[in-house]
Amino acid sequence: MEGLEESFKAIVEVLIVEILFFLVAWYLQSIEASNYGWTSKTFMMILGIAGVIIHKRPREYGLIPKNLKFDLKWSAYTLIIFILTSISTITVSFFLNHLRPIKLNVIITDFLWFFIFVGFAEELFFRGYIQSRLNEVFDRRFESFLWVRFEWMEGTLITGVIFFGLPHILTAINPFKGRIILTPLIFLITISACFMGVVLGVIRERSGDILLPTVIHGAIDFMTFGVGRLIGLALSNITTGIALFLFFLLIFEGMLKDEA
């Protein structure tokens, strides 16, 4: 009974925090605040840090690197895959004369946005605060993930699907503006977010912190949308798909089994 009560308290806690984020983000969007995206993601970071501070366990909540050598090693491998894949596609686009003009400051801004205000902000909030909090009470363990023998926790699954993946539908909704724009693309994005939310959660469990998931998250979004400015979103989505295929094929299993 006590365990059920603690689980309920944890769910209510993180649910309130996530609802608070969406209410603020929706409001900022409804008043058409300049740079509302930057402001809302800053608020997300503040909420994530506050959650970690309140529970007084920054290392357990992934804010402090547990194994920096591990993080840097697998971050480098990940970036090599994404960079080489991007270069290949950009090169082909160049010779086909399909490259779009883009200023350097736009590339720098996109890099900052996708790695810090999307990658870091969301990993801090979801994998740092929410996943860590839920794994304190939802501690049932699974023995493998996909084809890899690796033990991971139920709280990671709940976070990745219910608190990270499914809420992507809410990006198409704004109750303050009376807007509901649900398209097949939104549902496709939501399904992929549920899957990648669990993947990033499992990697966060393996690494012990949010650094590596942040790099992976940032690389995916920067390649899709940042590089997409240069080669077009259709081609950049294909490129991201290829990079993820290579990621799972070449390094994912080694990452989870690395004893370093």
Question: Residues of each region from the PLM?
Answer:
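Transmembrane helix-loop-helix hairpins at the membrane interface
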Residues: 108-260
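N-terminal, membrane-interfacial amphipathic/helix-forming hydrophobic leader that caps
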Residues: 1-86, 90-91, 104, 177, ...
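Generic, low-specificity signal for short hydrophobic/alpha-helical stretches with a mild N-terminal bias
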Residues: 43, 50, 94, 98, ...
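Helix-boundary and loop/linker segments of multi-pass membrane transporters
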Residues: 3, 67, 99-109, 146-151
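Alpha-helical transmembrane segments and their membrane-interface junctions
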Residues: 86-102, 166-178
